[in-house]
Amino acid sequence: MAEEIRFVSGQMPSLLYATKQIVAASAITRAIHRHERFTEMLYVYQGAGQYIAGGYSYPIRTGDILLYNQGDLHEVTSSLQHEIGTLCFGISGLQLCGLPEGHFTKAENGFVRPAMDEIDHMQSLSELIYEHAERRTSYSDEIVAQLLPALVLLSANLPPDARAADQPHNLVLANRIRQYIGTHFTEQLTLEDIGEAMSMSPYHLAHIFKEITGMSPIHYM
């Protein structure tokens, strides 16, 4: 039986924001980004796409929970013409036993959890939190404060599936290189700059990136 994940004693997370992505909207390209002072979790209520977090790439579908560790680069893209339907929650003060502050999971356990038998609970909790966060009344704030810890613990304790299996090292590195370029696109980057940031030699970096993407980092930029 897997070890249960619990909060550090006396440490309860707080909701910073709740947003709902409407499926009817046309799919848009979002900038790769990270959050240095808080974390996020998303519930996919409709659609399919891809989630990349910390360089690890996962196909995602309805009923998935997307976990994010504070400080990691991440992005969600739809595989259809329309936006993937998600409920997104920004969370501060997350402290789970055995994990660094702001971390939902260890990378080797993957960043996606299928809701499976808990899908009805996940849907209901996510919708309730979003709706009450939108109301912004004192009693709604209290409801959110009570429901959010339940959603977080339920999500963190869901078992990973086969998508959490080891991913090719070079694929993870190529994703991290691409994400680094994406967050520094306004700068005049050189291979040496990227190599220094990734702790890799420029030659090795360029070789891996071309092997995975079919183009050099310079052409990608």
Question: Where are the language model's segments positioned?
Answer:
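Cytosolic nucleotide-utilizing catalytic cores of signal-transduction proteins
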Residues: 139-142, 167-174, 186-187
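Residues that scaffold the ATP/ADP-binding catalytic core of kinase and kinase-like folds
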Residues: 52, 97-100, 208, 220
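Ligand-binding loop in jelly-roll beta-barrel domains
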Residues: 71-95
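Generic protein-terminus/edge-of-domain signal
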Residues: 1-65, 72, 80, 103-105, ...
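Short, Lys/Arg-enriched anionic-surface-contact patches
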Residues: 164-172, 216-221
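Basic/polar phosphate-binding segments, predominantly the helix-turn-helix DNA-binding elements
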Residues: 176, 180-182, 187-221
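Amphipathic alpha-helical segments enriched in hydrophobic/aromatic residues interleaved with Lys/Arg
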Residues: 102-162
